[in-house]
Amino acid sequence: MQEQKNLLIAEGGLGDFLQFLPFMLANKPNRPRYLVLVHFKGVQDLFKKFGIKVERFVTYTLDDEKAKKWKELNVTEAFSQVPRTWFFEENPFKPQKPVFNNGKKTIGIHLNGSKNSLDTRIKQGKPPKELPPKIVEDLSDYNILLFGLPEEVQATGLKQSDTVKFITYLDIYQSLSYVAQCDAMVASDSSIKSMSSMLKIPTFLWMGDNEDYWRDLYFVDPYVKAGVMKTFRYVFAAEDREYQRGLQLTKEYLNDVLST
């Protein structure tokens, strides 16, 4: 009788999935047993696209719901966490046709974090993961790919142009596949900045000025240390003085990394 394989747990959001992906792809022939708890429902479609088999898939909205569902699972066997990888050796997402061909540098912009993270931070009284939409106009010297859900981008009132294009696919695989076209990324604390930093694309992160051990441990410190990411910490990004300071630092960073 074949011995049952140990259970591997993968939990979190889309950014976590991206860090789990290299291990999962490398170990597909071994067919590990995965229990997945995730607050981004689109991740389930990503598992299917990559042909990764999951034994149990559980979705949740907020952390208190996750704790309740974990208790209901009543996992009694030994398990391990899926190992994380900081960088992709090769981009696992199929490239898309280039959006721009005008010779200008292209930056990606992502204004919002996930609904889960936004709701949680409001509940905890922490700075929201949101950039003012006017940053798109203030960085108009570059081609811009604006990432986000359709309703998020529509709510900004921004318009597409020859140098501003929206990447708003409901199929998250398709949206993530456009990140590789960016020469640099300017983003809130979100999965898009995780994708760009894992591809070693220079990434400028606007992040709330609050303690967040897991955010810093997994999604910030490794990339800052590697020289891939630089951060600007804010209390309220829409406040004019803070915004202007963040914009200045963003422009200086882009000028530095894109001037070569």
Segments and roles (model prediction):
Residues 3-6, 104-105, 142:
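Nucleotide donor/acceptor-binding cores
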Residues 60-106, 113, 117, 256:
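A nucleotide-sugar donor-handling region in carbohydrate enzymes
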Residues 8, 15, 106, 170, ...:
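Catalytic phosphate/metal-binding cores of nucleic-acid and nucleotide-processing enzymes, i.e., regions
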Residues 20-29, 114-146:
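Conserved catalytic-core segment of nucleotide-activated headgroup transferases in glycan assembly
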Residues 40, 194-260:
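Nucleotide-sugar donor-binding patch of glycosyltransferase catalytic domains
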